[in-house]
């Protein structure tokens, strides 16, 4: 008999599975790795997670489009493989370049070191370090400064929460996002217009993503100004909250592992950002920014066809793709319950897979380790006393994590 799951019940199920992912998903990986119950699906094994994320024809991100439309308009994070997606993806990839990575690393180190130098024996890893550094570096690179960091963070978090997390369509979350979008759109429109005027006047302008987008030749797929605004809003909303959370939860995990934290600090002191990154990304495997991604089954299809676990997923089903579970699948990951910094990058699904692999993957593979290096390279850190030393949340986002800096 089919089981009807209301949207609000789906939201509750996502939360409860997330709260108990380790206890629930391990037995599912073994005994029932693919779940299909009425309009709901869940995949838990690494091969199946990558199959679903890689099959954008059957498993779509179409559910994000209506919310994006009311916020600003379509942008690549919520587009399936269409001519619009390919055009805008090509335009953004032409201006967000691999050769920019050293510049982003240096900017991150500089901003992070300023924060540590100004601290007096204690710093909040979220509010006083990660959030202002990420905002400064990433919006500086994009060319999209907000009125101030608190406003930019509020805009990004509220928009992200409605578009990507509000599966229960709570009116309060939607209203808050629409209000903030009403502030953010004219702010960016004015900034884009001012930059375009400066370019036309021959004024000196920064070599950032916005300038590059505005200077793209028409025959190379140049985006019009409203499309530029759509995608910049999408990049800001999709970038700042997720990187901040990823950094915060990784630091929380390392603080729970004193031996690994000590070795990560030594790597930072030695200037080995690649090794620092290995500690951070391994910490994220145990405590991820998100435990699953949501996809909608566009056409009835079978996952893991030809295997004993082959399961039909119905058209319209909401499918939770359990990325954290995939990173603990012993069929794909060696010694998954050990904390190891020698893992191949393929073991990680932090940034998704397939068509909608995180657009910022290459940047974040150096930006997050640089952020960690700036925090860890100096005084030894430990939890601040009391409640301040534990990771705190404001809704879905980390809001505080105090650490003491040794003399």
Give short role names for the model-derived ranges.
Residues 1-407:
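Cytochrome P450
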């Amino acid at each position: 008999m089919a089981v009807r799951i209301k949207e609000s019940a789906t939201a509750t199920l996502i939360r409860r599975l997330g709260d108990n992912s380790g206890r629930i998903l391990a037995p599912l990986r073994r005994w029932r790795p693919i779940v299909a119950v009425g309009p709901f699906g869940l995949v838990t094994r690494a091969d199946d997670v990558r199959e679903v994320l890689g099959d954008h024809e059957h498993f779509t991100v179409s559910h994000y489009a209506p919310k994006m439309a009311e916020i600003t308009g379509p942008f690549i994070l919520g587009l399936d493989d269409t001519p619009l997606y390919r055009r805008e993806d090509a335009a953004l990839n032409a201006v967000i370049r691999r050769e920019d990575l050293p510049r982003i690393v240096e900017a991150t180190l500089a901003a992070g070191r300023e924060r540590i130098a100004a601290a007096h024996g204690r710093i909040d890893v979220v509010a006083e370090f990660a959030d202002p550094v990420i905002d400064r570096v990433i919006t500086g690179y994009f060319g999209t400064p907000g009125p101030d960091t608190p406003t930019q963070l509020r805009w990004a978090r509220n928009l992200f929460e409605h578009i990507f997390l509000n599966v229960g369509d709570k009116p309060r979350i939607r209203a808050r996002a629409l209000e903030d979008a009403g502030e953010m759109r004219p702010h960016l429109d004015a900034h884009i217009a001012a930059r375009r005027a400066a370019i036309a006047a021959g004024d000196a302008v920064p070599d950032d993503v916005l300038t590059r987008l505005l200077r793209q030749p028409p025959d190379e797929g140049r985006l019009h100004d409203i499309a530029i605004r759509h995608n910049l809003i999408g990049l800001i909303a999709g970038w700042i909250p997720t990187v901040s959370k990823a950094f915060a939860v990784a630091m929380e995990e390392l603080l729970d592992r004193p031996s690994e934290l000590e070795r990560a600090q030594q790597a930072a002191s030695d200037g080995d950002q690649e090794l620092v990154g290995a500690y951070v990304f391994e910490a994220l495997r145990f405590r991820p920014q998100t435990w699953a991604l949501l996809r909608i089954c566009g056409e009835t299809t079978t996952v893991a066809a030809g295997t004993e676990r082959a399961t039909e997923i119905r058209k319209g089903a909401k499918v939770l793709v359990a990325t954290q579970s995939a990173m603990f699948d012993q069929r794909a990951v060696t010694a998954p319950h050990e904390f190891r910094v020698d893992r191949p990058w393929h073991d990680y699904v932090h940034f998704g897979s397939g068509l909608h692999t995180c657009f910022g993957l290459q940047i974040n593979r150096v930006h997050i380790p640089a952020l960690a290096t700036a925090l860890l390279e100096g005084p030894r850190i430990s939890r601040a006393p009391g409640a301040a030393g534990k990771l705190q949340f404001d809704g879905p986002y980390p809001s505080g994590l105090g650490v003491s800096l040794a003399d």
